Amino acid sequence: MMKVLVVFALLVTLISYSSSEGIDDLEADELLSLMANEQTRKECIPKHHECTSNKHGCCRGNFFKYKCQCTTVVTQDGEQTERCFCGTPPHHKAAELVVGFGKKIFG
């Protein structure tokens, strides 16, 4: 009976060691993915900054990604130019307001 317990303990030790190696590999892959996401996040355009040259490069807000919102600006010379900035669209603002209100009520 003692031999069976020793063999069982040895098998459990080997299995836990091999599974922890797999977990370490998984954590390394996740870490690389997070580092890549962090690099992308550093390169994105923050809220209220100009996005005229990169309309799909806005950062993420609390719940949604900011959208590049453009307007036509007329200079004193009468020349029209398009100016864009990263911002939160009205329907996203409404959704964030509802979620924030729900969190306050339901905790």
Curated annotation (Swiss-Prot):
InterPro entries in UniProt: Spider_toxin_CSTX_knottin, Spider_toxin_CSTX_Knottin_CS
Top-level taxon of the source organism: Eukaryota
Pfam families per record: Toxin_35
One GO term describing the cellular component: extracellular region
Subcellular location: Secreted
Transmembrane segments: none
UniProt xrefs under PROSITE patterns: SPIDER_CSTX
Keywords noted in UniProt: Disulfide bond, Knottin, Secreted, Signal, Toxin
Ranges in coiled-coil conformation: none
GO terms of molecular function: toxin activity
Disulfide bridge positions per record: 44-59, 51-68, 58-86, 70-84
Domain notes from UniProt: The presence of a 'disulfide through disulfide knot' structurally defines this protein as a knottin.
Protein name per UniProt: U1-lycotoxin-Ls1b
Organism field: Lycosa singoriensis
Organism ancestry: Eukaryota, Metazoa, Ecdysozoa, Arthropoda, Chelicerata
